[in-house]
Regions:
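FNR/FR-type flavoprotein reductase catalytic core
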Residues: 81-224
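Short, Lys/Arg- and Gly-enriched loop/turn segments at beta-strand edges
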Residues: 51-61, 102-110, 250
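Ferredoxin-reductase
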Residues: 2-91
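Local cysteine-cluster metal-coordination motifs and their immediate loop/turn environment
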Residues: 125, 203, 225-254
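Short microdomains enriched in Cys/His and/or Lys/Arg
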Residues: 251-264
Length: 264
């Protein structure tokens, strides 16, 4: 059953909004109440001003919440009109959002070492988890994938968080290993040293990571991306097909037990 929505309306002000990789931006907003309640793996649903015909909010995972500073940092890719307008919001710009949305990562209590697998703009919620694991003294290794070197984000963050091993793969070989990140991830899972796997990125990547985790009897969670209209369970536009029926990503996700997901 979905948990009751914990989302509330929050006004925010842009602190900074800058490009950190090709087509990928870091947005830092001031939203003190939100910053104190977000948990790793949750998301926010942002109203982007500038187009009266655009009625839907933009659902985005977050990277870091600083309760002391009252700020939230969100990484996003410019992929359409809404995110293009979001990228044009400068310091001092204001709007509102709904959050925190959904529920976050659920790391098993007996996990001693985790494997984190992130691809493309799926890095932020995984990096957020990495920093949380570090605070909890849980060891972790990381596999990061991107289309090319110009689109890689998060490597320094994973290293700073204390990752044991960091493997980078790019489709074109312009940075790290050439190929798909699922290959080294599957090999690492075969070593039998992980108690948990978390993955976010392209659907096919998460599907293959989930398959490798199942083959090695390792509990795996995935953070799924879906278009949303409301973000609090009323519209049924973000449904995920699972073995237990259709589940809304906004309420039952965005993180799911990978073994129960039918369509990633």
């Amino acid at each position: 059953m979905p948990t009751p929505s914990s989302a509330h309306m929050h006004d925010f002000e842009v602190v900074s909004n800058k490009e950190i990789a090709q087509g990928i931006f870091s947005l830092v907003i001031s939203a003190p109440k939100l910053a104190s309640t977000l948990k790793p793996g949750q998301f926010v649903n942002i109203a982007v001003p500038g187009d009266a015909s655009s009625l839907l909010r933009v659902p985005l995972s977050y990277y870091r919440a600083d309760a002391e500073a009252g700020t939230v940092e969100i990484w996003y890719a410019v992929v359409g009109d809404d995110t293009r307008r979001l990228s044009q919001m400068g310091p001092g710009s204001t709007s509102d959002l709904l959050g925190p949305g959904g529920h976050g990562w659920n790391v098993p209590a007996d996990c001693n070492r985790a494997l984190l697998v992130a691809g493309g703009i799926g890095v932020p919620p995984v990096l957020c988890l990495a920093e949380d694991l570090s605070r909890r003294c849980i060891a972790f290794d990381v596999c990061v994938g991107a289309a090319c070197g110009d689109k890689v984000v998060g490597l320094d963050g994973f290293k700073a968080a204390g990752a044991g091993e960091v493997v980078l793969c790019t489709d074109d070989g312009s940075a790290g290993q050439k190929g798909f990140v699922t290959d080294p991830a599957a090999k690492m899972l075969g070593l039998g040293k992980y108690g948990y796997v978390a993955s976010c990125g392209p659907a096919i990547m998460m599907q293959k990571v989930a398959q490798a985790a199942a083959e090695n009897d390792v509990y795996c969670e995935v953070s799924l991306e879906r278009m949303m209209s409301c973000g609090f369970g009323a519209c049924n536009t973000c449904n995920v097909e699972t073995v237990d029926g259709m589940k809304g990503a906004c309420m039952c996700g965005p993180t799911f037990d990978a073994s129960k997901v039918v369509v990633f």
